[in-house]
């Protein structure tokens, strides 16, 4: 297997390979934009043939298959992606990780019908999210063997080997309408916080490498230099946020836009809607649970000796409108089998927990869940009686609460 050795960067030559422009001291230039649509008209370049390449992405779906308040569901997400593909046949569809874990629906179905969903959209690959490890490494490796093409440049074995179930990068070759071809490399990156945000047993035998080092190995000093590809895109499950001056949230990833050879960054993890540029590199993220899809458009000019590619605009598109009948039928079957379409009728009032508004606050849902923990503890026959007379406090991580409980319906 290919060995990935970590060395200290000590020479000026390597530093020049590391960064673009004036090097590590280049000021961070951030262009912040609100959600917008790109209606750029591609001008005809005399003597050359132009075309448009679109990168369509979604992230942090978290198994949100069923349509609910604020969650469009798998059917609408799929149809929104297909609509974009109809507008431009030169479209590559990508996931940025955290695909299946996160909903009760997903847990009891073990991620189904995600394979059919990915197949319908022709998802080329996925970054590895921290929640990909929730159900253990065997599930992840089996999933990769069946239907998921994972990319993970900064996850290696603790022996320094690359992974058997994921590649550091994957190259997609598209035959364009102009008669040419374009080759795009997608380098996968995962938040290094995964090392302490998931069960140690689930990542046993793995190591998480500094993302800037891993991306550099797979970009300037490898892919572009060897002339293998026309573009390099970072597909990173690392948080971004429009409120952050540097856009990228994690300290060890802030220099990624300054790596020589990086043409775009498609991000996930922080559940934000992001469309911006750092160091003239476009950065995008498409919310959570399929609420949005991201789209980056590039002009491809066919010239003698290769392609000239430039970014022409982006869009964060809200998922809405018609739903895909095939995917809806699969979801409905699962809902019927497990009784998930039935409504609770005991709650007289809605218990509100909106993660976009009061995620960090005391909420009725949080109180209800932690009270249930206390009651379960007190009613457990295995708990010694002397412990039950002591004060008992229920504690729940705020990230585990993801939805409200609707008001019940009166019957009879």
Write out the residue ranges for each language-model feature.
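N-terminal secretory signal peptides that target proteins for export/translocation
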Residues: 1-6
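Non-catalytic terminal accessory segments
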Residues: 8-10, 16, 23-58, 62, ...
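Alpha-helical structural elements
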Residues: 13-14, 128
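N-terminal leader/targeting segments
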Residues: 14-17, 159
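Acidic, metal/ion-coordinating pockets
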Residues: 25-321, 364-372
């Amino acid at each position: 297997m290919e060995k990935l050795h970590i060395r200290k960067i000590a020479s000026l030559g390597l530093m020049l390979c590391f960064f673009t422009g004036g090097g590590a001291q280049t000021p961070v230039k951030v262009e912040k934009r609100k959600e917008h649509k790109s209606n750029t008209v591609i001008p005809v370049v005399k003597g050359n043939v132009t075309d448009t390449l679109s990168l369509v992405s979604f992230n942090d779906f978290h198994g949100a298959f069923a349509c609910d308040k604020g969650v469009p569901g798998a059917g609408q997400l799929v149809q929104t992606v297909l609509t974009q593909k109809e507008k431009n046949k030169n479209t590559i569809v990508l996931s940025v990780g955290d695909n299946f874990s996160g909903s009760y629906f997903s847990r009891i179905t073990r991620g189904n019908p995600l394979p059919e969903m990915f197949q319908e959209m022709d998802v080329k690959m996925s970054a590895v999210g921290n929640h990909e490890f929730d159900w253990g490494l065997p599930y992840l490796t089996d999933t990769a063997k069946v239907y998921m093409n994972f990319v993970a440049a900064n996850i290696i074995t603790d022996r320094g080997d690359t992974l058997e179930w994921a590649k550091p990068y994957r190259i997609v070759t598209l035959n364009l309408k102009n008669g040419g071809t374009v080759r795009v490399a997608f380098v996968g990156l995962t938040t290094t916080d995964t090392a302490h945000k998931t069960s140690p047993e689930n990542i046993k035998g793995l190591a998480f490498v500094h993302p800037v080092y891993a991306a550099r190995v797979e970009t300037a000093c490898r892919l572009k230099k060897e002339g293998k590809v026309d573009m390099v895109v970072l597909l990173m499950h690392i948080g971004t946020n429009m409120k952050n001056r540097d856009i990228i949230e994690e300290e060890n990833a802030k220099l990624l836009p300054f790596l020589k050879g990086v043409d775009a960054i498609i991000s996930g993890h922080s559940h934000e809607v992001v469309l911006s540029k750092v160091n003239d590199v476009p950065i995008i993220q498409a919310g959570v649970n399929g609420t949005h899809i991201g789209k980056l458009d590039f002009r491809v000019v066919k010239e003698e000796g290769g392609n000239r590619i430039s970014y022409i605009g982006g869009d964060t598109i809200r998922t809405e409108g018609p739903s895909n009948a095939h995917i809806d039928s699969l979801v409905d079957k699962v809902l019927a089998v497990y009784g998930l379409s039935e409504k609770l009728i005991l709650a007289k009032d809605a218990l509100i927990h909106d993660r976009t508004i009061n995620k960090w606050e005391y909420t009725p849902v949080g109180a209800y869940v932690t009270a249930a923990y206390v009651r379960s503890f007190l009613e457990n026959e295995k708990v010694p009686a002397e412990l039950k007379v002591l004060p008992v406090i229920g504690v729940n991580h705020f990230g585990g609460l993801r939805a409200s409980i609707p008001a019940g319906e009166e019957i009879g």
